[in-house]
Amino acid sequence: MEVKMKILLDEDGIRRSITRISYEIIERNKTVDNIVLVGIKSRGDILAERIKQKLLEVENIDAPLETIDITYYRDDIDRKNFDLDIKDTEFKTNLTGKVVVIVDDVLYTGRTIRAGLDAILSKSRPAKIQLACLIDRGHRELPIRADFIGKNIPTSHSENIEVYLKELDGKEEVVIL
């Protein structure tokens, strides 16, 4: 069976989405000097770096950037057989009292974001947590919504969204399969 692929965002579309998200973060927050960006591996961290660069370009604010690996906090792993080589997230920046913007590539069920929230809240007490995602595809299983969205793409459960970024994949596009 042939898999049909449709490009949802090309390189320019991704760049424009990141620019819009960055401006929305600036507009939503009274000051951006209290913002910490937290990217979820393995594409949210790259998108967070791009937002960081845009905030620096527009507001001349060098927002701290953290990366989280949510593997330790997932709700679909068997903790008894947990791989002890997986390290818990340690933040270099104190997130307590800060406005934390979690960045991820695709928002789907909300479970990845819940794991990210657990990772952050187990270590700190931010003043506020906001969520930025490049693609919101719907189908939540948890009451989570994004504050900043690049593009809303309603999908069926049988469809997949793939985000390709130059840093990891050598190409820049978002496709639906």
Swiss-Prot record:
The GO biological-process annotations, alphabetized, read as: regulation of DNA-templated transcription
Q: Which Gene3D superfamilies match?
A: 3.40.50.2020
Among InterPro entries, the record links this protein to: PRibTrfase_dom, PRTase-like, PyrR, PyrR_bifunctional
UniProt entry keywords in alphabetical sequence: Glycosyltransferase, Transcription, Transcription regulation, Transferase
Protein name (record) = Bifunctional protein PyrR
Q: Relate the protein's function as given in its record.
A: Regulates the transcription of the pyrimidine nucleotide (pyr) operon in response to exogenous pyrimidines. Also displays a weak uracil phosphoribosyltransferase activity which is not physiologically significant.
The reaction(s) catalysed by this protein are: UMP + diphosphate = 5-phospho-alpha-D-ribose 1-diphosphate + uracil
The species this protein was found in: Fusobacterium nucleatum subsp. nucleatum (strain ATCC 25586 / DSM 15643 / BCRC 10681 / CIP 101130 / JCM 8532 / KCTC 2640 / LMG 13131 / VPI 4355)
Q: Name one GO molecular function term.
A: uracil phosphoribosyltransferase activity
Binding locations of substrate? 42-43, 104-112, 137
Which Pfam family is one of those matched by this entry? Pribosyltran
